[in-house]
Amino acid sequence: MKTQTIFFKNPAYIREVASIAGPKEAEGPIGSYFDKTVEDDSLGQKSFERAEVMMHTTTLKYLLNKAKMRSAQIDLCVSGDLSDEITGANFTMRSFDIPFLGIYSACASFAESIIVGSTFIDAGHMDRVICSVSSHFSSAERQYRFPLELGNQRTPLSQWTVTAAGALILDKDKGEVKVECATLGTVIDYGVKDANDLGAAMAPAATATLVSHFRCTGRKPDYYDAIFTGDLGEAGSRILRSLMIEEGYPLPDSYNDCGVLIFNREGQKVGQGGSGAACSASVFCSYIYKKMLNGELNRVLLVPTGALLSKTSGLQGETIPSIAHAVSFVKVQ
C-alpha cells in the first residue's frame, strides 16, 4: 500500500458553505452560527423522510444562492445520508440537473464527499463540486433503533441524531480556505454490538485514522489549531483521548467533537451528544468555517466518524464496524 494520505497538488478551495438545522440544534450552543433553522422538524411534510429531503434540497438551493451560481455552473454533486439506499440524497437530486454521485460512509460521509470532490478537481476533471449530507433524528431512530411511537427509554450512552443538512462548493479557483490533504480510513471493528453505544464503536476507527495521518505526514497533533472528530460524543471522545495516549499521540486541549459542540448535553437531554451524517457537516459549514474565515483557526483537521451497521446487521447480532476519514483544511494567507 502506498499511503493512506493524499496531498492534493492542485487543491480545491471552498467557494461557499450552507447549513440548515432543526429546532433542537437551534437551541444548542452554536445555534446562532447556522444559516437557517426550522421551528418544526416535519417541515410540513407527510413523513420525516420527506422532511429530510426537503431540508437537504433547501440547503443546496440556499448554497447556490449564497454563491450566486446556477446549477449549470456545477460539474458534480457528491452527497449522502443515513437512509436505506441513500434515498434522502437520491430524492434530493431529483430537483437539480447536476451530475450526481451518491456516497455512503455513515456519519463519515461528509469527509468522503470532500475527498471525492477534491480528487476530481485535483485531477482536472471538474471545476466546481458540491459536497453535501443530511440526517434527521426521527428518520434515523425509526431505521436504526425504535420508532418514536414506541416511547422507548434512551440509554445513558446513546446519542441524539442531528437534524440538519450541510453543504459546500469546492472550486478550482483560489479561495480563502483550501483542502490541503486527506487521510482515507480503514474499517475497524472492536466487537461492540450495542447500537446505543456508537461512540465506543467509532473511537477506535478515529484513532486508527489519526495515527495513520500523523505517521504519513510526520506531524504531531499540536500542528493543527484544532482537531474535530465528527460525532463520538462525550464518552467516545474520552475513549479516543485514552487510545491516542496509548499510541503516543496525546490530543491537545484544542481537540473537540462536533457531537459535543452542537448540543448542551445536560440542558437538552441528548445523552452523550450529537451524531448523524449532518453532525460534522453542519458544524463545519457554520461554526468551524466561520472561525477559519475570521482567522481564529488557520489549520483544522476534521475527522468525521461512521458506524457501518444496518438495521439488518443489528438484528442478526453482528458487531459494528466503523470508519473515519480525515480532511485537512488550511486558511490561505
State each model region's role.
Residues 81-97, 137-150, 236-237, 283, ...:
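Active-site-adjacent elements of ketosynthase-type condensing enzymes
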Residues 90-93, 232-247, 312-319:
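Short glycine/threonine-rich loop-to-helix capping motif typified by GTGT followed
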Residues 79-80, 129-135, 300-305:
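Short beta-strand segments
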Residues 14, 49-105, 223-238:
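Conserved beta-ketoacyl condensing-enzyme motif
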Residues 101-108, 256-259:
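A short, structured active-site edge motif that brings together acidic residues
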Residues 104-131, 170, 275-296:
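Active-site-proximal alpha-helical scaffold in enzymes
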Residues 52-68, 116, 201-216, 283-288:
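Short, well-ordered amphipathic alpha-helical segments that serve as non-catalytic structural scaffolds
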